[in-house]
């Protein structure tokens, strides 16, 4: 099972809580996190893009770095770990993204890939005059399909002449092309999103569900498997979980309850308002899950709470779901959490024995 880290490009990571660690994003913080991930043998890091936050008492995600420039910097200071940036496709033309990706491929010596997002929060784009109107909610993946076609043509052949509804390319050129095959991630959970992923992407990212229910996401993966059956492509699912661990189950649970007690209701209200703006994409989108009030404190991602041994066992259960390639992890405290994961959780995981074995061999 592959394991990656969803690095905190926005302030406070993924906890909307006054009781959680409060911090600003910086290159130095994300460099430390990425180097720790590499040190502990993790496989990749991914940075999101967020152009406007949720406000509230914690100013949640009101402060963000930019994904491509951050990953370019990280590419220059790492040697093994794979790096994924996120492209806000309403802001950046595909030919520019293709060239930026090729550049970071060069910096990283072939360790770069791309996450594509359509955009679901109107104020992120309206503030720049780039929101195409609410009818876009229902056509996001038609737009993204043309976008991905341009990317693939440029990366694979160095040229695109695509004439579509959204993009018209005229002898568009790209050189140098990436030295390694450029992998595409998509996190769309709607039917249209699944169809796009099965057609154009290499990995599907989905939310875990519930607290200490590591296989509850299985129906999402099954839906992707159905979409893949129509395209015949090899696409695996990666699942997002928050890890809250401590020496004992009781200590970890106490932290989780403390975070929940400080939930930022104002920030969550903003999230709910923005989620309700999309009336066209159906009930199965990521934003529908994020805006559910059940576990507002961490936008309803799957959460693994317990001792190091408990979390290790729960993570080993994740990979038992057919079609699952790995997990994407976030932590309440990234630096301590990563060290605890690398030294106290990962060595207990059956699904990561190959990594611990390699690390022991390197030491020897």
UniProtKB/Swiss-Prot annotation:
Binding site for FMN: 49-50, 115, 124, 140-141, 190
Keyword flag Flavoprotein: yes
Enzyme class: oxidoreductase
Record-linked InterPro entries: Luciferase-like_dom, Luciferase-like_sf, Pyrimidine_monooxygenase_RutA, SsuD_RutA_monooxygenase
HAMAP family, per the entry: RutA
Family: Belongs to the NtaA/SnaA/DszA monooxygenase family. RutA subfamily.
Name of the protein: Pyrimidine monooxygenase RutA
């Amino acid at each position: 099972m592959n394991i990656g880290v969803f690095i905190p490009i926005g302030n406070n990571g993924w906890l909307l809580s006054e009781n959680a660690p409060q911090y600003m994003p910086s290159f130095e913080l994300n460099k430390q996190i990425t180097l720790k991930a590499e040190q502990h043998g993790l496989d990749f890091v991914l940075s999101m893009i967020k152009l406007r936050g949720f406000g509230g008492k914690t100013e949640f995600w009101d402060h963000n770095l930019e994904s491509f420039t951050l990953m370019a910097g990280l590419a220059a200071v790492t040697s093994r770990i794979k790096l994924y940036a996120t492209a806000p496709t309403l802001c950046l033309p595909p030919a520019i993204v293709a060239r930026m990706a090729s550049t970071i491929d060069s910096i990283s010596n072939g360790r770069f890939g791309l996450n594509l997002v359509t955009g679901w929060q109107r104020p992120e784009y309206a503030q720049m005059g780039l929101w195409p109107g609410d009818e876009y909610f229902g056509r996001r993946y038609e737009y993204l399909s043309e976008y991905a076609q341009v990317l693939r043509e440029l990366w694979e052949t160095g040229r695109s002449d695509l004439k579509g509804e959204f993009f018209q390319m005229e002898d568009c050129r790209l050189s140098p092309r990436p030295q390694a095959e450029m992998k595409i991630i998509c996190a769309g959970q709607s039917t249209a999103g699944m169809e796009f992923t099965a057609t154009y992407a290499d990995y599907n990212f989905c939310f875990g569900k519930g607290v200490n229910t590591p296989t509850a996401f299985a129906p999402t993966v099954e839906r992707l498997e159905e979409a893949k059956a129509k395209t015949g492509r090899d696409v695996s699912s990666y699942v997002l979980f928050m890890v809250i661990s401590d020496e004992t189950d009781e200590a970890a649970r106490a932290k989780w309850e403390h975070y929940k007690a400080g939930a930022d209701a104002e920030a969550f209200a903003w999230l709910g308002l923005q989620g309700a703006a999309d009336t066209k994409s159906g009930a199965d989108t990521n934003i529908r899950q994020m805006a559910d009030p059940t576990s507002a404190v961490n936008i309803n991602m799957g959460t693994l709470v317990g001792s190091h041994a408990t979390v290790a066992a729960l993570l080993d259960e994740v990979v038992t779901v057919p079609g699952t390639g790995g997990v994407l992890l976030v932590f309440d405290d990234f630096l301590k959490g990563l060290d605890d994961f690398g030294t106290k959780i990962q060595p207990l995981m059956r699904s990561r024995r190959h990594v611990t074995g390699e690390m022991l061999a390197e030491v020897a």
